[in-house]
Amino acid sequence: MDALSQLFYLHGIGYEFTKYTGEQVIFSEDTRKRALQCCGVNTEDEHQIAQLNYQLDVAPWLELAPDTSLVNLTDNLFYIRIDERQRDLPVAITLPKLNVTYERANLHNLAITGDYYVHGVRYIEVAVPLGAIPVGYHQALVSVGEQSKEVQLWATPEKVFQVDDTKRTGLSLQLYTVKNKAGLGIGDFNDLLELCDLCAQQHMDYILLNPLHLLFAQQSERASPYSPNSRALLNPLYICIGLSADAKNNPQLDALLHSDEVKALFNSNEQFINYEKVSAVKYELFKALFSHFEAHASASRRDEFAQFCKQNAQTLTTLNSANPTFDYYLQWQAKLQLSHCQQHCLNKGMAIGLINDLAVGCAGDGVEYQSQQSLFSDNANVGAPPDPWAQAGQNWGLPALNPQQLKNDHFAFYRSLIRANMQGVGGLRIDHVMALRRLWWCFENNHTQDGCYVYYPFEHLLAILKIESHLNQCIVIGEDLGIVPPEVKHALAVSGIYSNSLFYFEKQHDGEFLPLQELPKHCLIMIANHDVPPFCGWWQTDDLDIKRQYQLIDDQQYQQQLHERQQEKQRLLRFIQLHSAEQLSETSDAMCVYGELAKALAHSETRLFALQLDDLDKQTYPVNIPGTNTEYPNWRRVLTHSSNAIFKNNASTLAAVNSIRKGYE
């Protein structure tokens, strides 16, 4: 292997991949060079290449242990690397905060798990058994003879946090679309509280949310929760004014609530959220809350706020705000209300409660990127390889993290990100979970768009998910739609991470829907989500009409897709008829078909089954059309009915699904 090829391998630059057609595609050396250049490597500098190869391949064998050393709690083995001539020396591994030291007189009679020759000297890796260690990150001092090194010892459980292995039902929704009881034009945490009550009454165990990440207050129309300003901070627009302690006895706030601007918003009843108006009004109300806090807050509340700022200083300071205390206050209020909703779920008997959603990346001009720029690649974005729906591939416009820089940072950024998204909830869905293993990088190469897979330190990123899930008592769902490498699928299953399936895509080779008994068990299954049309729209082919209306497809494509949809509907009817005595046809009412489909899927052994609020509301307009930006008003469509009305209208279906899932029928 030549020096450049070695560096490709050590830096995680992919060599080949399997295309959606089944064809094996080998990346050109030119493409791989460009990817390496995006990592800050001068591919024409032989000295730099040799130096990097030494740092990544040889140097680790000259250290007693990696800076971040994983200890799997199934065997409690700690791996030490030594010159084989040092096996007679005593070894000590000290964990100061646990007040524990593990000592051995020598390193003989231990399993050798690897070796490497440097200048003719054999270095070996030996497995040192330790005692029981609590899950978490521990500072450790490793000593062999006179040589010593401080490392982070990550005590990693075999699986992520688990709940009892039983069939559960839940609700999925985009919180901003919920009909706001306060009339302020966007769903908020009080609306979420109401949904907690409604779900608990139907014996549901969880509510799957959209990403609640911070967006752009100064550019309020940038509405995509999947292209956020920061994934570690919350969107203040979800704060319910009335839930804040600072709303009580607040004359300034009361006057604003009776203003013409608020009344206009209250009476607007628009189909699509006007983020500019909503944001302008809510931020005026936020200022009134903050003014009241500054003037009247008790000493205990001030201490609570100060403690929040201290505990979250690293994340809060990324805001780089002109009025930091105000922005920190909003983050505090949002965190309090989210945690209150989660506790309310648990108090009502829900086994999991809220499930948060973590976007795969952040915007290139956001505070997350700007504050951590050294961790990101140069001029490479995250995307997807060519597929039948995007022959040229997809560029999602999200900066790609540099895997080597993540490692050099001791993964502090990723640990902090996962922790922030697991706090105050009972579960976390990881969007595009394959990113733990590899991501498709998009970059310009000789004035044309190019791309390849780049691999990430999978074992460490997976360890963080396992550790944080236990520390936060949080289940993990990995969104694995699309091409999933076999090693990722296996590792996620072994780690107890739920997969995520869309029923629309669960097909056999002949195009028929998978039989119930073949649906994955340790999985979250949904009929639809934010990337596909709501069921009524799909059944009535409204989504195709909308695409034609917005000139996303021409008449010929419309007719072709209409024909394909008719075939799909026939396949769906055949699936339902295997599990239902109801006589249905293509002309059947969409909600009748939906109800029978929901009841059929309720019989599956799949552990998590989510009903989408959009579907229960009989929505025909999608909340998002993938591949569009300004062509369609994505991330804005509001639900037609109140949450209470939606549950009332679907009472019989919800009761039947619950009865089937609980085994009463």
What is the predicted role of each segment?
Residues 618-665:
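Structured C-terminal cap/extension of enzyme domains
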Residues 37-74, 81-104, 113-137, 142, ...:
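Acidic/aromatic-lined carbohydrate-recognition and catalytic surfaces
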Residues 14, 205-206, 351-353, 427, ...:
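Residue-level detector of anion-binding/catalytic polar loops
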Residues 1-59:
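Long, contiguous interaction/targeting segments characteristic
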